[in-house]
Amino acid sequence: MSNYEIMILANPDSTLEQVSELLFSVLKKSDTKIEKLERSELAYPIHKLTRATYYLVTVKSDPQLMAELTRKLNIAKFILRSLIINLDSEKGLKPRKVKRFIPRAKNNDRSANQGDRRPFIRRNQTTDASKTEASTEATASKQSEQTTTKPRTRKVSKEQ
């Protein structure tokens, strides 16, 4: 025997007796609790109706009886929609893991955080002194070549 919760949207002209008669034709009265919730406006029309009455039913029953009840709810003309939830097998929401708050250091000095920082090193660079000297000489020669070339001049038209 499992616990079930049934939400029923019924025609607003239907009565509690009609709904309970339909439910008790399948279920036992001792294990069933019917609660009329409210009559409210629907978000969209169902069978050309814009209002419906909500019923909440809690039941302790066998799955075979719930299958029969589902069939009868689908056949009944005054039932607009129904939803059956097995409360025993429904997992529901799990609580979130809360991340712990770690406050920042109260000192806003940059010197306090210097121990955490590492200098940026390119992967191609090495610490060998001979290679660094060679690379500086190469860059110096490239710069001197760039300065020896003539700069481009823009032609200005005299028609302006």
From Swiss-Prot:
Pfam family, one: Ribosomal_S6
GO molecular function: rRNA binding; structural constituent of ribosome
GO cellular component, as recorded: ribonucleoprotein complex; ribosome
UniProt biased composition (Basic residues): 151-160
Biased composition (Low complexity): 126-145
Region (Disordered): 96-160
Swiss-Prot/TrEMBL keywords: Ribonucleoprotein, Ribosomal protein, RNA-binding, rRNA-binding
HAMAP family (UniProt xref): Ribosomal_bS6
The name this protein goes by in its record: Small ribosomal subunit protein bS6
Record organism: Metamycoplasma arthritidis (strain 158L3-1)
